[in-house]
């Protein structure tokens, strides 16, 4: 016996509006940063004793992973993002829209991934602007897309614990 396919309205694909919202907000903020802030440490804006706005280019991935390479990493991370986006969209098409937790998590990851892919393809780098620090230690700069990817991933991990506890 086969399962009845979900319509677009019934499936989690309905939650892709959130991915679009994340993408638009991410690109909009990055454009404001690029148009209104000087590049680099000397042009940082001190906001709080532990937080700066800082316009920098990231040629790698999270934590500037592989940023010192010759440029091939740009296409590797773009390819990974396309595969992940396709996979998550497929999973959303199989999930009922009422399963909000996972659909929201997937949409947050998709929106962030597409935002960073846009930067990589259009600029050749990802724009980062959030700089948190404690004393002289600075966490690697990041952006809204990175934040939504991490929140979505954390939601998926937490969901694994929720389901595990529910089976006890």
Curated annotation (Swiss-Prot):
<feature type="active site">
    <location>
        <position position="146"/>
    </location>
</feature>
<keyword id="KW-0378">Hydrolase</keyword>
<keyword id="KW-0472">Membrane</keyword>
<keyword id="KW-0997">Cell inner membrane</keyword>
<dbReference type="GO" id="GO:0004190">
    <property type="term" value="F:aspartic-type endopeptidase activity"/>
</dbReference>
<comment type="similarity">
    <text>Belongs to the peptidase A8 family.</text>
</comment>
<keyword id="KW-0645">Protease</keyword>
<dbReference type="GO" id="GO:0005886">
    <property type="term" value="C:plasma membrane"/>
</dbReference>
<feature type="transmembrane region" description="Helical">
    <location>
        <begin position="15"/>
        <end position="35"/>
    </location>
</feature>
<dbReference type="InterPro" id="IPR001872">
    <property type="entry name" value="Peptidase_A8"/>
</dbReference>
<comment type="function">
    <text>This protein specifically catalyzes the removal of signal peptides from prolipoproteins.</text>
</comment>
<dbReference type="Pfam" id="PF01252">
    <property type="entry name" value="Peptidase_A8"/>
</dbReference>
<keyword id="KW-1133">Transmembrane helix</keyword>
<feature type="transmembrane region" description="Helical">
    <location>
        <begin position="141"/>
        <end position="161"/>
    </location>
</feature>
<comment type="pathway">
    <text>Protein modification; lipoprotein biosynthesis (signal peptide cleavage).</text>
</comment>
<feature type="transmembrane region" description="Helical">
    <location>
        <begin position="107"/>
        <end position="127"/>
    </location>
</feature>
<keyword id="KW-0064">Aspartyl protease</keyword>
<feature type="active site">
    <location>
        <position position="128"/>
    </location>
</feature>
<keyword id="KW-1003">Cell membrane</keyword>
<feature type="transmembrane region" description="Helical">
    <location>
        <begin position="47"/>
        <end position="67"/>
    </location>
</feature>
<protein>
    <recommendedName>
        <fullName>Lipoprotein signal peptidase</fullName>
        <ecNumber>3.4.23.36</ecNumber>
    </recommendedName>
</protein>
<feature type="transmembrane region" description="Helical">
    <location>
        <begin position="75"/>
        <end position="95"/>
    </location>
</feature>
<keyword id="KW-0812">Transmembrane</keyword>
<dbReference type="GO" id="GO:0006508">
    <property type="term" value="P:proteolysis"/>
</dbReference>
């Amino acid at each position: 016996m086969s399962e009845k396919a979900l319509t677009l309205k019934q499936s989690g694909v309905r939650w892709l509006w959130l991915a679009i919202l994340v993408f638009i907000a991410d690109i909009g903020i990055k454009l404001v940063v690029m148009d209104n802030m000087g590049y680099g440490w000397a042009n940082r804006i001190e906001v709080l004793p532990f937080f700066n706005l800082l316009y920098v280019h990231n040629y790698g991935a999270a934590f500037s992973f592989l940023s010192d390479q010759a440029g091939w990493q740009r296409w590797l991370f773009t390819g990974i993002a396309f595969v992940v986006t396709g996979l998550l969209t497929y999973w959303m098409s199989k999930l009922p829209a009422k399963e909000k937790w996972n659909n929201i998590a997937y949409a947050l990851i998709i929106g962030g991934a597409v935002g960073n892919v846009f930067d990589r393809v259009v600029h050749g780098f990802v724009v980062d602007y959030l700089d948190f620090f404690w004393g002289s230690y600075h966490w690697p700069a990041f952006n809204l897309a990175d934040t939504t990817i991490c929140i979505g991933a954390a939601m998926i991990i937490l969901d694994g614990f929720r389901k595990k506890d529910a089976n006890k």
